[in-house]
Amino acid sequence: MKNGVPFITMPKEFSASADITMAVQAGPRLVIDGSIPKLKEGIAARTAVGITRDGKVILLVTEGSPITLQELARRMKISRYEGGLECANAMAFDGGGSTQAYAKIKNFELSIDGISYITNGLAVFAK
């Protein structure tokens, strides 16, 4: 986040500064300014983060059915009316056996277990 605004950029274009409050490195990038780059083949469970055209941050974890990076990118990019998430930019985190998530928001609770022991994660808390 820079000045309270989330963004996704290339590592070579990133530079630490006082107005950066949080940064994570991951990849590959799935959607870059509305375009999908060439991505590796192969299906797996996936974890990703995207930023919609109106600045909302979406954390995504697939469950049940493995998916290719290309299909994940397509679903993150396309419109809500087409069943997508309308992300202008998105990137993948580690997937496969380490894909997992936990969320508890009011009366909603979600727990997706992975097969691998995870020592690092990304946490989101209310202000």
Model-derived regions, located:
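Gly/Ser/Thr/Pro-rich low-complexity, intrinsically disordered segments
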Residues: M1-K127
